């Protein structure tokens, strides 16, 4: 499947929603510390409901520790500074999709090391700055999953 990477997430409700999304899609979740909340935060638990046990979650102390542990072949950064739209990328099994913290995004020190074609964006209107983190993850996850034929999904309607 694919992997979602949250770089230093700050808002527990967003992370809880993303945990629930990962449980429902089979995508793995990586959390790069420091987190802006404690792991036992009741807001994290409430927003993720009882889905925490159904999601595969890995925590990493630093971005470098994440890279060393996972060795991603293709790591995409979702950023307002991206060039191709999320729907223009041809996702593959094994891809990693990284999202930055809610108030500041992925640091430029990381973005500057990435190829331009791996810095992707979600289209928005001219006056918009950014989208909510959990919404951005959901939009991108479902586009990637659609491209992969909803691998692992059940009860798919037949299209004629």
Swiss-Prot record:
Places the protein is found: Cytoplasm
Annotated keywords: Cytoplasm, Methyltransferase, S-adenosyl-L-methionine, Transferase, tRNA processing
GO biological process: wobble position cytosine ribose methylation; wobble position uridine ribose methylation
Principal place of residence: cytoplasm
GO molecular function, one term: RNA binding
Gene Ontology cellular-component terms listed: cytoplasm
Job of this protein: Methylates the ribose at the nucleotide 34 wobble position in the two leucyl isoacceptors tRNA(Leu)(CmAA) and tRNA(Leu)(cmnm5UmAA). Catalyzes the methyl transfer from S-adenosyl-L-methionine to the 2'-OH of the wobble nucleotide.
Name of protein: tRNA (cytidine(34)-2'-O)-methyltransferase
Natural source organism: Haemophilus influenzae (strain ATCC 51907 / DSM 11121 / KW20 / Rd)
């Amino acid at each position: 499947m694919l992997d979602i990477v949250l770089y230093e997430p700050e808002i527990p409700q967003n992370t809880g929603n993303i945990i629930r999304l990962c449980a429902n899609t089979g995508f793995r979740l990586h959390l790069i510390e420091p987190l802006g909340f404690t792991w036992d935060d009741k807001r994290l638990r409430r927003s993720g409901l009882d889905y925490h046990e159904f999601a595969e979650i890995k925590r990493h102390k630093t971005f470098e520790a994440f890279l060393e542990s996972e060795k991603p072949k293709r790591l995409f950064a979702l950023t307002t500074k991206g060039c191709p739209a999320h729907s223009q990328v041809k996702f593959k099994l094994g891809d990693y999709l990284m999202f930055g913290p809610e108030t500041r995004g992925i640091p430029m020190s990381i973005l500057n090391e990435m190829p331009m074609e791996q810095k992707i964006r979600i289209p928005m209107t001219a006056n918009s700055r950014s989208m909510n983190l959990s919404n951005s993850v959901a939009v991108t996850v479902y586009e990637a999953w659609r491209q992969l034929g909803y691998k692992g999904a059940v009860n798919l309607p037949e299209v004629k």
